[in-house]
Amino acid sequence: MDILTQIENYRPYNEQEERDKGLILDCLRAFEDVFTRENALAHMTVSAWVVNERFDRVLMAYHNIYDSWSWLGGHADGEEDLLAVALREVREESGVKNVRPASEDIFSLEVLTVDGHMKRGKYVSSHLHLNVTYLLIADDTNALTVKPDENSGVKWFTPDGAVEASSEKWFREHIYNKLNEKMRQFRRENERKGR
C-alpha cells in the first residue's frame, strides 16, 4: 500500500493528528516534490519511537541542531517507503543493529515546524516537516554509537524520563507524552490479544 493510501486510512488519535493528517494529505496531493528537500516549504520526514521488548525504555539521541534529547528519524530524501527510512535512520543514528517494527502501521502523524538554521555551512530557511512516526522495537543490549554529524549522545530512558530529558517544551507536551500514551495503549491491546 502506498504512503498516500496509508495516511488516508490512518485513524487520528486526537485533534492534533486529525488536523495534521489533513495538511499532510493536502501537501502530498499538491506537491510532486514533497518527498525531497527540493520542496523548501514542506517535505516528508519520518520519526521512530523506539522502545525495548518490555516497553519500559525509550531510545533517544542528543540532537546537535536542536540541542536536546530527541526521537530518532530523518528526511525521506526521495524514498516513499517511510518504514524502511525509519529503520535505516535508527540504525545509522544509534548503532542499534536489532530493530524491527512493533507494527507496520503508522503510529502517529505530526506537522513539525523547523526554524531556520545552519547546516553544513549553509542556511536552511524555516519550513515544515510532514512527519510520519513508527513504533519500533530494538534490543536494548546492543551497543550504542553516536552519529557525530547529527547527534552527540544516544541513550535509553524510561518512557517518562525520555519526555523529561527533552528541553523542547512543545515536543514534550504535544508529541512525546502522546507517543507514550499510545505506546502504553498499544502494549495493553497486544497483551489482551496474547502477543
Q: For each predicted feature, which ranges?
A:
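Generic secondary-structure boundary/loop-capping signal
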Residues: 32, 41, 66, 141-143, ...
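N-terminal strand-loop-strand
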Residues: 36-71
